[in-house]
Amino acid sequence: MSTATPLAPTPVTTTDVLIVGAGPVGLFAAFQAGVLGLRCELIDVLDRAGGQCTELYPEKPIYDIPAVPGCLAQDLVDRLLEQCAPFAFPMHFGQRAESLSEIPRQPAPDGHAAHERLLVTTDGGKRFDVSAVLICAGAGAFAPQRVSLPEAPALEGRHVHYAVRDVSRFAGKRVVVAGGGDSALDWALALRKVAARVTLLHRREGFRAADGTVAEMREAVAAGEMDFVVGMLGALRTEGQDGPLTEVEVRTRDGSTVLPADELVALYGLVSEPGPIAQWDMDMRAGRILVDTTTYESSRRGIFAAGDIAYYTNKQKLILSGFHEAALALRRAYHYAFPEKALVHVHTSNNAALKEKLTHA
């Protein structure tokens, strides 16, 4: 009689603060955590940092950031990444915060109750043991717009993908990348280096992507390094009822065509939804998290919110408001991470070690 070997549990990452969302507010929060001496890690459902600024309007001008008369949304993200880079906090992309539970601790030797910690698990299986969670998820978790074909759900996660988490899984495969934005073109260009063949599929000749990226794609097509087809997904064909993907049927202006395919990467853009966070037993208002404006803590101890996801009277949906909210939230979170320490305010310019880190990164 044989017995199956049990799967090893996913390792748990222990840190002080988990920041949910790597948009502008989440990135500034990471910088603030570093300034305060907090360890942190960031997760985001997207495949890169920047949130809405990167995915929806990278070329949008922004004029209301203090001391920055004007910049493009992507430029702001790039500057925030540069600002928090000295602390080298890990960022985990393609990960949606899924479940939250409390980790009871044994009483301390002196008889005082130990601080309860939190365990956050993502849909990708990552687990984080933290003192506090700061949710900077904008209007909610951005979820990919899914393929609407009836055969798609059974193939999701196996042969139909909405993000590229591991390039190596596409090595030697015939890949169709569907979409017309920056993500679709970027990944089509990247995957052509490892895949047997890449075909970019878009419903029209024009793209919602940077001119330079479009030019690079057209050069790759002209050089025979990849293919480009104008059309829309019509059907997904498999080998048998539950077998792997073999072909993608495409509806074109002249009828239809069939593309050989082992993998489909659909990058149609994003839709906003509260996601599992809405089930974390916090007081919510219209899909946003009700917070105390003294600390920006939610009704659940140790869970904070900053940015558009936070709700309070006279809330202003401005990036600069999110910066302020994150800064105050982390100062309260510090007391959960280090209950025995007093947080002493120090100007960054007067802290020699911090100044050295920030100026010589």
Curated annotation (Swiss-Prot):
Assembly mode: Homodimer.
Keywords: FAD, Flavoprotein, NADP, Oxidoreductase
Note on cofactor: Binds 1 FAD per subunit.
GO molecular function, one term: flavin adenine dinucleotide binding
Gene3D superfamilies noted in UniProt: FAD/NAD(P)-binding domain
Positions with a binding annotation for FAD: D44, Q52, Y57, A97, F142, D308, S349
Protein family according to the UniProt entry: Belongs to the ferredoxin--NADP reductase type 2 family.
Cofactor: FAD
Catalysed reactions, semicolon-separated: 2 reduced [2Fe-2S]-[ferredoxin] + NADP(+) + H(+) = 2 oxidized [2Fe-2S]-[ferredoxin] + NADPH
Pfam family for this entry, one: Pyr_redox_2
EC number(s) from the headed UniProt entry: 1.18.1.2
Listed name of the protein: Ferredoxin--NADP reductase 1
